C-alpha cells in the first residue's frame, strides 16, 4: 500500500467520531493512491504524501465555495491541490485539502438511495483525484475521471456511481 499522512478535522456537522472517520478515510484513500500508482503509473513522493480532510456543514462549505470558486451555494466536496499538478506527474509532498459537507452528502445519498458511507467513499475518491490534477470540466476529462472513480470504487466493492452496474 502507498503511504499517506492524512490529517482530519471535524469542524461542523453530525459526523462519526474522529477515530472512526480517520480509519475509514485511510482505508479509502490508501486504496485510491495504490490504484493510481499501480494502474495509472502515478508517481508518488518517497515520503508519505500529506493531505488534510475537513468535515464540515453546508453553511461552512457554502462560504468556502463562494470565496474560492465564486459560487454562493453549498456543494458536496471541494478540493484544493497544494501545488498545480498534471495527472501522471510527481505531486509535491503536500497533496492538498479536501472539504466535505455533511448535509449535502446525506441528502445526495438519500436521493441516490445509496448508503452514507458509500457516497462518502465516492466523494473522497472524487476529491482525491482532483488533488492529482484530474478534472471534469471538459467531456473527455470527465469521462477519464469518472472511469477512474468507477474502477477505484469497484476495488473497494462499490458499484458504479454513474450507472446501475454492479462492480466487476
UniProtKB/Swiss-Prot annotation:
Cellular-component GO terms for this entry: cytoplasm
Protein name (record): Endoribonuclease YbeY
The keyword Nucleotide-binding is assigned to this record: no
Gene that this sequence comes from: ybeY
One of the protein's GO biological processes: rRNA processing
Role, per record: Single strand-specific metallo-endoribonuclease involved in late-stage 70S ribosome quality control and in maturation of the 3' terminus of the 16S rRNA.
Family: Belongs to the endoribonuclease YbeY family.
Binding positions (Zn(2+)): 126, 130, 136
Cofactor binding annotation: Binds 1 zinc ion.
Family matches, as SUPFAM superfamilies: Metalloproteases ('zincins'), catalytic domain (SSF55486)
MF-aspect GO terms: metalloendopeptidase activity; RNA endonuclease activity; zinc ion binding
Cofactor(s) required, per the database record: Zn(2+)
EC number: 3.1.-.-
Amino acid at each position: 500500500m502507498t503511504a499517506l499522512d492524512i490529517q482530519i478535522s471535524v469542524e461542523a456537522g453530525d459526523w462519526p467520531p474522529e477515530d472512526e472517520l480517520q480509519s475509514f478515510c485511510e482505508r479509502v484513500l490508501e486504496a485510491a493512491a495504490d490504484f493510481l500508482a499501480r494502474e495509472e503509473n502515478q508517481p508518488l513522493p518517497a515520503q508519505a504524501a500529506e493531505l488534510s480532510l475537513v468535515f464540515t456543514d453546508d453553511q461552512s462549505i457554502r462560504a468556502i465555495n463562494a470565496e474560492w470558486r465564486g459560487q454562493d451555494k453549498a456543494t458536496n466536496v471541494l478540493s484544493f491541490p497544494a501545488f498545480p499538478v498534471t495527472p501522471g506527474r510527481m505531486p509535491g509532498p503536500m497533496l492538498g485539502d479536501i472539504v466535505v459537507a455533511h448535509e449535502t452528502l446525506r441528502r445526495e445519498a438519500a436521493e441516490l438511495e445509496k448508503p452514507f458511507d458509500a457516497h462518502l467513499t465516492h466523494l473522497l475518491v472524487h476529491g482525491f483525484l482532483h488533488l492529482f490534477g484530474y478534472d471534469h470540466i471538459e467531456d473527455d476529462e470527465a469521462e477519464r475521471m469518472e472511469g477512474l472513480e468507477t474502477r477505484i470504487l469497484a476495488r473497494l466493492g462499490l458499484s458504479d456511481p454513474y450507472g446501475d452496474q454492479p462492480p466487476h
